């Protein structure tokens, strides 16, 4: 079989599919998305046009504030030649009690896809249930698959491959952490999540990851020991201690509980000498990481932020019919 025939076969698997969680995608499919993102990144660097979705329309429904997700998606959609329509629930009849199933079916008649950033994973799934066009999860409280793709692309660029790489994660055990656990289990990375006792990953996420890890050879370790997590890590990943949409009333308690888990220069020095520092942003200097670390030579944070656009572009180009 010719290479282009094989590529065509896997490409056909994407058309019309939703992108709700990385759990719905195989190792081969995720790798194909990452390769597609790299192709788009190279085209953009060379100023080569890639308007694969010219004439398409995409709705963007955001219930949460956003900097990177909104800007990266709108830029990606523009580069692909499509039009995007940004909405909040307050600007729609959702604010007056219109059911999701009605809103979903109306959007479906106007647009070729929906990008949604919301709270409950169940909302994303309900839109997907009532829409024929693809639905993209741009963040829920449970998962953040678009961030997961950007993280994997960044690690692959900086480290050459994914399998066997050790990620030390320190921060809130929330959507980004869940997607990193899922990605690691599928792609064969080793992830060590360091957190205070009592802050544990979602049971459904862990059950999936443990089953996948048996096949991929990944190590999924949840620990209270930051030093063992960071030791010999290829990637040191910090995240906020009080995630957006999380229990804000617990903010002060979380700051106290997570204080021993700050990534500073001393902690980063315990990782491999060529380890990279990552953070999904927004970041709080002086809490989960120091200014010295995020602004230091090992920081890959800005490349990581840029890669949101390239990976989102790949997803949209692959799934929008």
Q: What is each PLM-predicted segment?
A:
Residues 2, 105-107, 112-183, 279:
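Anion-binding alpha/beta catalytic cores of soluble intermediary-metabolism enzymes, centered on
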Residues 210-292:
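Rossmann-like adenosine-cofactor binding region
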Residues 80, 110, 130-131, 187, ...:
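Short, structured coil segments at secondary-structure junctions
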Residues 6-71, 75, 143:
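Positively charged, low-complexity intrinsically disordered leader regions
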Residues 57-110:
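Active-site cofactor/substrate anionic-group-binding motifs, chiefly glycine-
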Residues 274-275, 280-321:
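Adenosine-phosphate binding glycine-rich loop
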Residues 63-76, 157-239:
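Glycine-rich phosphate/diphosphate-binding loop of Rossmann-like nucleotide-binding domains
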């Amino acid at each position: 079989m010719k290479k282009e025939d094989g590529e065509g076969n896997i490409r056909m698997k994407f058309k019309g599919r939703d992108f709700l969680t990385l759990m719905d995608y195989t190792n081969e499919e995720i790798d194909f998305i990452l390769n597609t993102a790299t192709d788009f990144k190279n085209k953009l660097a060379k100023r080569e046009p890639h308007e694969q979705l010219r004439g398409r329309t995409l709705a963007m429904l955001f219930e949460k504030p956003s900097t990177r997700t909104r800007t990266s998606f709108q830029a990606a959609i523009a580069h692909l030649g499509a039009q995007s329509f940004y909405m909040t629930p307050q600007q729609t009849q959702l604010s007056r009690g219109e059911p999701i199933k009605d809103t979903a079916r109306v959007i479906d008649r106007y647009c070729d896809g929906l990008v949604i950033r919301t709270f409950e994973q169940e909302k994303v799934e309900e839109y997907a249930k009532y829409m024929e066009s693809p639905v993209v999860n741009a963040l829920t409280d449970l998962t953040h698959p678009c961030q997961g793709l950007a993280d994997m692309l960044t690690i692959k660029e900086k480290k050459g491959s994914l399998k066997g790489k050790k990620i030390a994660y320190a921060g809130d055990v929330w959507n980004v952490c869940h997607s990193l656990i899922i990605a690691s289990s599928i792609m064969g990375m080793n992830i060590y999540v360091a957190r205070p006792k009592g802050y544990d990953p979602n049971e459904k996420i862990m059950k999936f990851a443990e089953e996948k890890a048996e096949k991929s050879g990944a190590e999924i370790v949840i620990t209270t020991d930051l030093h063992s997590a960071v030791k010999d890590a290829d990637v040191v990943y910090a995240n906020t201690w009080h995630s957006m949409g999380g229990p804000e009333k617990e903010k002060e308690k979380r700051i106290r509980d997570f204080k021993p888990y700050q990534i500073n220069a001393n902690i980063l020095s315990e990782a491999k000498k060529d380890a990279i520092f990552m953070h999904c942003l927004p970041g709080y200097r002086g809490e989960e990481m120091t200014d010295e670390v995020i602004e230091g030579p090992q920081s890959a944070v800005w490349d990581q932020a840029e890669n949101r656009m390239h990976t989102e572009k790949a997803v949209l180009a692959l799934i929008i019919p």
